[in-house]
């Protein structure tokens, strides 16, 4: 069946499973009030007042009540989607919700009512200018938030904080483009428009503001995605003990027998609101045990995908030949923290130090068993992540936002280089400003392909 963005659509808007309340939502698309009024009459036996809660029966085709609950009618454009919307809020049992949903589809078949696709209600809100693209993505991020900090940041994006900063940057770039275009269009004038309007100073200020927005977006991306942290090292160096210490719970089995962990144990923990996906892995060593070999192979697969590797060492022996061989296989470009564990058996005090800034290699001494120095490791992980403690204005951001912001930053840097050249480079200056503007507009959806929209909204749940 060929679907369009103007079809009437319906879906269950609440999460699957049993609950006190279940919501069925209809957005009437191009059919509008011509479909809304007769469908309300068929489903509730009443004509509903706009934006007023009515306690009504939800009727089947014979006029018998399937359920009773609250019906809300939102005429366009004052609704979530910007279209005429009807919500039936009844009991949250899966059977009764499916009955009400099917009744809606049957009653609305004459108007082309169909089941909504994932994210289609929010897509309509975007297409009808109720939300821009960054705000629409924030709806999904708010639903999926795994920490309080992520939820609050998603809320800021939904309220438009991120979008307002992007729109302000776009307006500044447009103003600067106008100055450049004026200079190009009137070359015979003696006035230097760029010099008179302090164009270079304006560009510098735009780049400074963009840098601030990018910094906030990076923080938001951390809150959304978190970090993948892999515990690696020889058997019996305390990897499982460290996982338990970081999590504050007995998640992994700890014994003095080397090779106890044969497969990965994964746990997501929070540090200052950042989700850390910590993975305890099988000890790395030469072995003839076929099961253990499989676990070791999986360990290396996890290391290849890690954002950070915690290389655990026994503080009593330090870096051994075997540890050197393990470290030599770590992927380039991945930050590594050498964790000297079991300091309680050596008399060493917990401490942190940088080993190689260029390689992002550092060292933390701690005792996972006693908990001494674990706080230092948490601080080191925050440093590696680039987290700025106490950030209050963070908005949740996605990888595509960061890519667009970095691209805009590069175009503005190139524009600045052209601005310092002679007037023959002005057309290149103007072009780089245009490209920067396009990148910024792609964040809010001012310039977005249908393919991009399809990918974004397909990841929403049905009913949103």
Swiss-Prot record:
Name of the protein in its database record: tRNA modification GTPase MnmE
Q: What is known about its subunit structure?
A: Homodimer. Heterotetramer of two MnmE and two MnmG subunits.
Q: What is its EC number?
A: 3.6.-.-
The UniProt entry, under PANTHER family, shows: TRNA MODIFICATION GTPASE GTPBP3 (PTHR42714), TRNA MODIFICATION GTPASE GTPBP3, MITOCHONDRIAL (PTHR42714:SF2)
List ligand-binding residues for GTP.
Answer: 236-241, 255-261, 280-283
Where, in this chain's numbering, is Mg(2+) bound? 240, 261
GO MF, any single term: GTP binding
The UniProt entry, under Pfam families, shows: MMR_HSR1, MnmE_helical, TrmE_N
User: So what family is this one in?
Assistant: Belongs to the TRAFAC class TrmE-Era-EngA-EngB-Septin-like GTPase superfamily. TrmE GTPase family.
Q: Which UniProt keywords apply?
A: Cytoplasm, GTP-binding, Hydrolase, Magnesium, Metal-binding, Nucleotide-binding, Potassium, tRNA processing
Species of origin = Paraburkholderia xenovorans (strain LB400)
């Amino acid at each position: 069946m060929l679907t369009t963005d103007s079809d009437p659509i319906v879906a269950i808007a609440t999460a699957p499973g049993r609950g006190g309340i279940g919501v069925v939502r209809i957005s009437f698309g191009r059919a509008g009030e011509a479909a809304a009024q007769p469908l309300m009459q068929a489903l509730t036996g009443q004509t509903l007042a706009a934006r007023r809660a009515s306690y009504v029966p939800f009727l089947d085709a014979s006029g018998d009540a399937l359920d009773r609950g609250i019906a809300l009618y939102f005429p366009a454009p004052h609704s979530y989607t910007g279209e005429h919307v009807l919500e039936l809020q009844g009991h949250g049992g899966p059977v009764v919700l499916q009955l009400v949903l099917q009744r809606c589809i049957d009653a609305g078949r004459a108007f082309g009512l169909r089941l909504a696709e994932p994210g289609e209600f929010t897509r309509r809100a975007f297409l009808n200018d109720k939300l821009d693209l960054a705000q629409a993505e924030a709806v999904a991020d708010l639903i999926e938030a795994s920490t309080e900090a992520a939820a609050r940041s998603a809320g800021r994006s939904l309220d438009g904080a991120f979008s307002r900063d992007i729109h302000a940057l776009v307006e500044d770039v447009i103003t600067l483009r106008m100055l450049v275009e004026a200079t190009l269009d009137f070359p015979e004038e003696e006035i230097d428009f760029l010099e008179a309007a302090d164009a270079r100073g304006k560009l510098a200020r735009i780049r400074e503001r963009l840098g601030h927005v990018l910094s906030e977006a990076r923080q938001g991306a951390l809150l959304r995605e978190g970090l993948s942290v892999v515990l690696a090292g020889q058997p019996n160096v305390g990897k499982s003990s460290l996982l338990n210490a970081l999590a504050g719970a007995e998640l992994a089995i700890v014994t003095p027998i080397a090779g106890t962990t044969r497969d990965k144990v994964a746990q997501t923990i929070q540090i200052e609101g950042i989700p850390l996906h910590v993975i305890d892995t099988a000890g790395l060593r030469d072995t003839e045990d076929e099961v253990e070999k499989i676990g070791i192979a999986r360990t290396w697969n996890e290391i290849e995908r890690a954002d950070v590797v915690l290389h655990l060492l026994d503080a009593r022996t330090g870096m051994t030949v075997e540890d050197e061989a393990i470290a030599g296989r770590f992927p380039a470009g991945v930050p590594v923290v050498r964790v000297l564990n079991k300091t309680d058996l050596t008399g060493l005090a917990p401490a942190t130090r940088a080993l190689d800034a260029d390689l992002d290699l550092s060292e933390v001494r701690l005792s996972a068993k006693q908990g001494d120095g674990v706080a230092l490791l948490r601080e080191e992980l925050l440093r590696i992540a680039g987290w700025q403690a106490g950030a209050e204005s963070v908005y949740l951001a996605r990888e595509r936002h960061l890519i667009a912001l970095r691209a805009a930053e590069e175009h503005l840097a190139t524009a600045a280089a052209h601005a310092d050249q002679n007037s023959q480079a002005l057309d290149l200056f103007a072009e780089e400003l245009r490209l920067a503007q396009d990148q910024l507009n792609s964040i809010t959806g001012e310039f977005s392909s249908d393919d991009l929209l399809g990918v974004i909204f397909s990841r929403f749940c049905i009913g949103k």
